[in-house]
Amino acid sequence: MRVLLIAGGVSPEHEVSLLSAEGVLRHMPFPTDLAVIARDGRWLLGEKALAALEAKAAPEGEHPFPPPLPWERYDVVFPLLHGRFGEDGTVQGFLELLGKPYVGAGVAASALCMDKDLSKRVLAQAGVPVVPWVAVRKGEPSMVPFDPPFFVKPANTGSSVGISRVERFQDLEAALALAFRYDEKAVVEKALSPVRELEVGVLGNVFGEASPVGEVRYEAPFYDYETKYTPGRAELLIPAPLDPGTQETVQELALKAYKVLGVRGMARVDFFLAEGEVYLNELNTIPGFTPTSMYPRLFEAGGVAYPELLRRLVELALT
């Protein structure tokens, strides 16, 4: 068994991907080679890929797409790419054309989960509770049918990139302008208060397995990029201090959403808990594997160590 790990990418989450790759390489129980996609879209292989990992950045690559890789050498590809052109079905489609098994969700599920607007539409139709939201496209009038505060987010980014909390209607356009720097579509979501943020991991293909529920606590106005990836900025409680009924509800909703959206392999499912009601926020089909990332820590708390988690993900790619 030999694995190809692909990291980096052209999205704003480039550095997060490299941090995740460092952890995966350290704990992967199978022989693994690394390929890094630089910010310019070209690829780095071999020692140059490892050097980029060490530097935590790859501004320029060497090989244009498709890279000269010995694809027949690899049994499984692990696309550890966060955000657009990695988590949205793009790379998954390339791997489908190659006929290579890969870790994680397929093309359709990846694209659907990446789009915060479309995934909410599907989940709401299936009876999964979601926070009130409206989609706004670049160049169109912004009609928000609920009062602030609310969050403005690019529809297709992760790691809280491009997100603003808006307290007054007069600040909406500036928040949309920021979101439109990253996407042609934004979502405006009603801000819940007071609110607790919960996360649960799912592992499996048709029938997933839910991890214990965790809770994220922080002092920042919201769970932004710096809070997520700076050690000490957030406190992760595993298991979350919840009554058994709420914990069961969160796990059941995570598994239902996973199945409804057709996800395979893995996902981290994020929830809000407000006034006793649980709302699904989003599914991340390629969750972080950094030292502060919740997904591996959730499963470790459930008795699945990091190397065993990776082994199961690779084996799921082959089934």
UniProtKB/Swiss-Prot annotation:
<dbReference type="Pfam" id="PF07478">
    <property type="entry name" value="Dala_Dala_lig_C"/>
</dbReference>
<dbReference type="InterPro" id="IPR000291">
    <property type="entry name" value="D-Ala_lig_Van_CS"/>
</dbReference>
<comment type="pathway">
    <text>Cell wall biogenesis; peptidoglycan biosynthesis.</text>
</comment>
<keyword id="KW-0479">Metal-binding</keyword>
<dbReference type="GO" id="GO:0008716">
    <property type="term" value="F:D-alanine-D-alanine ligase activity"/>
</dbReference>
<keyword id="KW-0460">Magnesium</keyword>
<keyword id="KW-0133">Cell shape</keyword>
<dbReference type="GO" id="GO:0071555">
    <property type="term" value="P:cell wall organization"/>
</dbReference>
<feature type="domain" description="ATP-grasp">
    <location>
        <begin position="120"/>
        <end position="315"/>
    </location>
</feature>
<dbReference type="GO" id="GO:0005829">
    <property type="term" value="C:cytosol"/>
</dbReference>
<keyword id="KW-0963">Cytoplasm</keyword>
<keyword id="KW-0436">Ligase</keyword>
<protein>
    <recommendedName>
        <fullName>D-alanine--D-alanine ligase</fullName>
        <ecNumber>6.3.2.4</ecNumber>
    </recommendedName>
</protein>
<keyword id="KW-0067">ATP-binding</keyword>
<feature type="binding site">
    <location>
        <position position="270"/>
    </location>
    <ligand>
        <name>Mg(2+) 1</name>
    </ligand>
</feature>
<feature type="binding site">
    <location>
        <position position="282"/>
    </location>
    <ligand>
        <name>Mg(2+) 1</name>
    </ligand>
</feature>
<feature type="binding site">
    <location>
        <position position="284"/>
    </location>
    <ligand>
        <name>Mg(2+) 2</name>
    </ligand>
</feature>
<keyword id="KW-0464">Manganese</keyword>
<feature type="binding site">
    <location>
        <begin position="147"/>
        <end position="198"/>
    </location>
    <ligand>
        <name>ATP</name>
    </ligand>
</feature>
<dbReference type="InterPro" id="IPR011127">
    <property type="entry name" value="Dala_Dala_lig_N"/>
</dbReference>
<feature type="binding site">
    <location>
        <position position="282"/>
    </location>
    <ligand>
        <name>Mg(2+) 2</name>
    </ligand>
</feature>
<dbReference type="Pfam" id="PF01820">
    <property type="entry name" value="Dala_Dala_lig_N"/>
</dbReference>
<dbReference type="GO" id="GO:0005524">
    <property type="term" value="F:ATP binding"/>
</dbReference>
<comment type="function">
    <text>Cell wall formation.</text>
</comment>
<dbReference type="InterPro" id="IPR011761">
    <property type="entry name" value="ATP-grasp"/>
</dbReference>
<comment type="similarity">
    <text>Belongs to the D-alanine--D-alanine ligase family.</text>
</comment>
<keyword id="KW-0573">Peptidoglycan synthesis</keyword>
<dbReference type="GO" id="GO:0046872">
    <property type="term" value="F:metal ion binding"/>
</dbReference>
<keyword id="KW-0961">Cell wall biogenesis/degradation</keyword>
<keyword id="KW-0547">Nucleotide-binding</keyword>
<dbReference type="GO" id="GO:0008360">
    <property type="term" value="P:regulation of cell shape"/>
</dbReference>
<dbReference type="InterPro" id="IPR005905">
    <property type="entry name" value="D_ala_D_ala"/>
</dbReference>
<dbReference type="InterPro" id="IPR011095">
    <property type="entry name" value="Dala_Dala_lig_C"/>
</dbReference>
<dbReference type="InterPro" id="IPR013815">
    <property type="entry name" value="ATP_grasp_subdomain_1"/>
</dbReference>
<dbReference type="InterPro" id="IPR016185">
    <property type="entry name" value="PreATP-grasp_dom_sf"/>
</dbReference>
<dbReference type="GO" id="GO:0009252">
    <property type="term" value="P:peptidoglycan biosynthetic process"/>
</dbReference>
